Amino acid sequence: MPPFRIFLLSPAHCGGKRADLLLSERAAFPLAVRLRSTPGVTLGEAFSFLSGLYFRGKLAYAERFARPPAGARGVQVITTDRGLLSGDAPVGVEDLRKFGTVDISQDHPAYRLPLERDTKLLRQVENVEVVLLGSVATGKYVDVLLEIMGERLLFPTDFVGRGDMSRGALLLRAVRNDAELTYQPVAGAIRRGARARRVSVEG
């Protein structure tokens, strides 16, 4: 088993009511105020607000179980137009607005090319497993990542058949119990399945 592990987190949706609330110039809650100031907030903070339980679970889980080699980032977030960024990367209002204008599709060069660039750099790191914490049922992330990473691209087996909220609860419970999930290669996996039993954070 490789001694190192890096997690790739799918992004939060940068549109909708929560994005409108966070990006509003009238918003007075602390995160929104910091977002409008320099240097802004971290990408992890912004996406945790936008996505709620699911991204919060992904971030907490990845931070707990990442085992990166020296000089590598153990937690990397897929973005719509900037490839892979650290969860600690600073972002401001304009960054989030731009994220919301780019479609996540392998047919969209603004999304695909930066992600290909950074994934190829990641492939050069030896003896590392890469775990995708995101949907594998569609090709929006997998089609780009799998072509480059091949058998080294893994995902949590228990993600199959779960929706976003259930995955978030599963990940937070794993962190609370200090129990890492089982992974399997994306290549050749059954990526859709019957709906899994609902999981609570406390359960």
Language-model features, listed with the residues they occupy:
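Peripheral peptide segments
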Residues: 1-203
